Each structure stands twice: as C-alpha cells, then as structure tokens.
C-alpha cells in the first residue's frame, strides 16, 4: 500500500507499484511527501485551541508544510500527520530559471502535492 525505505530502490515508484486503499486511492502515504499550502511553524499546534476544525496555521511564513513521508522513510514515519517543512533555498539551487521559480523544486524528487476536493453537496463528510 505504500512505498518506503524497505520496498523502494531509493527512489519514487509508479502508482501501479502499490495497491489502492479502501477508498480506491494510492500513494496517500510514502513515495513522496505532499506539499501543502499551509505555512510551517514549529509551534503551530501548540498555539491552536482544542477542537479546532480545519486549522490553517500561521498566516505568513518562509517555508511550507510537507506531509505524509517519502520513499526513504521508515514505516513508522509514514502518517498523514507526519509534518515537515520545505527547504526553499536549498531546493532551488540548480533551478535554471532567472529569476528563480517560487514553485519548481528541481533538486527535490521526494515532494509531490495533495489534491483536495469538496464532496458533492448533501453528502456525509
């Protein structure tokens, strides 16, 4: 169901390499970390009130959140709640564009993105 350190040849794998989860989705954990629009702050959770619904984190920042673990992680690190941060400047070092892109991370092959969609109106959440 996941691509991680014990079943990857130290690189990403095609979606066909894993089985779908009960929702029919693949690669929700492992393979690549997912780039999120939330800004990263190491203390973001400690500043939230208990019971917060869909917390957004800080309004500004310098690095974004990445989640879910990657192909070189141990199984214990592959969780939806696993949270790290981008390393923007380091990941752009060999970007050939001038000026540098704010989105294209040519040096990091272990980050993807999460597709988010709303369920149809009237369905159970």
Model feature map: region roles:
Residues 1-9:
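Short, charged, amphipathic alpha-helices and their helix-cap/turn boundaries
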Residues 18-21:
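Short, small/polar residue-rich loop motifs at catalytic or cofactor-binding pockets
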Residues 8-11, 28-125:
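Surface-exposed recognition segments
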């Amino acid at each position: 169901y996941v691509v991680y350190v014990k079943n990857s040849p130290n690189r990403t794998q095609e979606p066909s390499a894993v089985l779908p989860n009960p929702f029919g989705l693949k690669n929700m954990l492992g393979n690549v970390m997912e780039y999120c629009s939330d800004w990263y702050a190491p203390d973001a959770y400690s500043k939230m009130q208990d019971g917060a619904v869909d917390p957004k984190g800080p309004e500004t920042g310098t690095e974004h959140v990445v989640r879910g673990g990657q192909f070189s992680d141990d199984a214990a690190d592959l969780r939806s709640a696993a949270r790290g941060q981008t390393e923007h400047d380091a990941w752009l070092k060999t970007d050939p564009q001038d000026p540098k892109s704010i989105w294209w991370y040519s040096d990091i092959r272990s980050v993807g993105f999460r597709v988010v969609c709303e369920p149809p109106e009237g369905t159970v959440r």
